[in-house]
């Protein structure tokens, strides 16, 4: 099931206090970038983030879910209505995220 553009717009609005938030459409789902690094994505209208050590510490009781069959588990962000929480989560995760891959 593809994610709704309206849900993407809601999440982007929640993250609008952060600099350099971007996204990429990927087969009906959306990859979310923060300052050039992949933080997570929107899958089936669920906000999922990479399970970095800082994300796990920030959301110790978060459920782990698969974004799609065959993928690695990610953390479900349930408190998407809380703008301050989301911004804090992305800032906490940033240093743990791998650098973007160089384009060939």
Model regions: which residues?
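Charge-dense, helix-prone N-terminal extensions
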Residues: 1-104
């Amino acid at each position: 099931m593809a994610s709704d553009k309206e849900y993407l717009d809601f999440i982007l609005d929640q993250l609008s206090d952060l600099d350099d938030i971007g996204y990429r459409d990927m087969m009906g789902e959306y990859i979310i970038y923060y300052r050039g690094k992949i933080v997570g994505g929107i899958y089936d209208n669920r906000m999922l983030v990479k399970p970095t050590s800082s994300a796990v510490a920030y959301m110790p009781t978060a459920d782990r879910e698969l974004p799609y069959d065959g993928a690695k588990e990610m953390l479900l962000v349930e408190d998407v209505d809380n703008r301050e929480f989301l911004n804090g989560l992305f800032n906490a995760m940033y240093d743990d995220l791998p650098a973007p891959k160089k384009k060939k």
